[in-house]
Amino acid sequence: MTYARIQGVGSYIPQQILSNADLEKMVNTTDEWIMQRVGVRERHVIANSPDNTTTMAVDAAKRAIEMAGIDSAVIDMIIVGTATAEYYFPSTACLVQKHLNLREDIPAFDINAACAGFVYALSIADQYIRNGGAKHILVIGVDSLTKVVDWKDRSTCILFGDGAGAVILQAHKEPGILNTILHANGDYSDLITAKSGVWERESVPHLHMYGKEVFKLAVTKLGEIVDEIIEKSGLKQSDIDWLIPHQANLRIIEATAKRLGLPRERVILTIEQHGNTSAASIPLALDAAVRAGKIKRGDTLLLEAFGAGLAWGAALLKL
């Protein structure tokens, strides 16, 4: 049997830091309130730097390729999860292909599942490798949500940061990704929006979110999906070594960890330093944990994410 196994990870965050103290000068909020309600102390932001969605994706990809120890010429697919592409078209994936000078006989495409984008992309890549359609896939989660937040809306501008994370998935005989599950419910599509498109435009496509409703649904749906994927995989909660959640809200993360019976020290947390980086948050956290020596080869990881759509998903894997 062929598995999709993570061979390398990489990430990138902009240099400029926006702290809660900075936000106190911009909107009516406090560091104490943000930490208690969300768990974010600072976030990295593109601001006026040369960074953008494409450049961050490229930098994260380079680091993942380097860790994987592969020649970039063997990459035979690129999938990018993003909701903040630099252009309507071409896709971010094609721009990554260009900047990395990858060969042309490969597919390269974006998928938009908002904050769940990386898990969605990982699931698609897993199916291609299992079915023999590819052997080395570059999967990237990247977003620049600080470019679409309303900096006068204290309920949302405190949440988000920018960044990118990438993995190299390689066909392998040893277990890698064990299972993925993806769900969506468009009936809740109005709960998180950034309305800018061909048919509906805002002069500035500000992000709007009904926070209380999203919080309740996230706790419920993520709790259900982690139970579902563990059962589907024939495992027990005690088999999970690490939870790597989407870094949206510390209270949501704690609710999922409690449901799994995992102590805080077995949960990878970067929300305090990064904020919510949308599709980038899981690969960013994974990269940080691997490079810090926390997560090691053979560990069983549970990834889960929830975002606009509403779309949510989970992945269970052996590193």
Curated annotation (Swiss-Prot):
GO terms (BP aspect): fatty acid biosynthetic process
Catalysed conversion reaction: malonyl-[ACP] + acetyl-CoA + H(+) = 3-oxobutanoyl-[ACP] + CO2 + CoA
The EC number(s) this enzyme carries: 2.3.1.180
GO molecular function, one term: 3-oxoacyl-[acyl-carrier-protein] synthase activity
Keywords in alphabetical order: Acyltransferase, Cytoplasm, Fatty acid biosynthesis, Fatty acid metabolism, Lipid biosynthesis, Lipid metabolism, Multifunctional enzyme, Transferase
Any single GO CC term annotated in Swiss-Prot or TrEMBL for this entry: cytoplasm
Pfam families linked: ACP_syn_III (PF08545), ACP_syn_III_C (PF08541)
Subcellular location: Cytoplasm
Active site positions: 115, 246, 276
CDD domains: KAS_III
Gene3D superfamilies: 3.40.47.10
Residues spanning the signal sequence: none
Family listed: Belongs to the thiolase-like superfamily. FabH family.
Free-text comment about domains: The last Arg residue of the ACP-binding site is essential for the weak association between ACP/AcpP and FabH.
Summary of subunit composition and partner proteins: Homodimer.
Function summary: Catalyzes the condensation reaction of fatty acid synthesis by the addition to an acyl acceptor of two carbons from malonyl-ACP. Catalyzes the first condensation reaction which initiates fatty acid synthesis and may therefore play a role in governing the total rate of fatty acid production. Possesses both acetoacetyl-ACP synthase and acetyl transacylase activities. Its substrate specificity determines the biosynthesis of branched-chain and/or straight-chain of fatty acids.
Alphabetical list of NCBIfam families matching this protein: fabH, PRK09352.1
Alphabetical list of HAMAP family matching this protein: FabH
PANTHER family, A to Z: 3-OXOACYL-[ACYL-CARRIER-PROTEIN] SYNTHASE, BETA-KETOACYL-[ACYL-CARRIER-PROTEIN] SYNTHASE III, CHLOROPLASTIC
Protein known as: Beta-ketoacyl-[acyl-carrier-protein] synthase III
Source species: Coxiella burnetii (strain CbuK_Q154)
Lineage, top ranks: Bacteria, Pseudomonadati, Pseudomonadota, Gammaproteobacteria, Legionellales
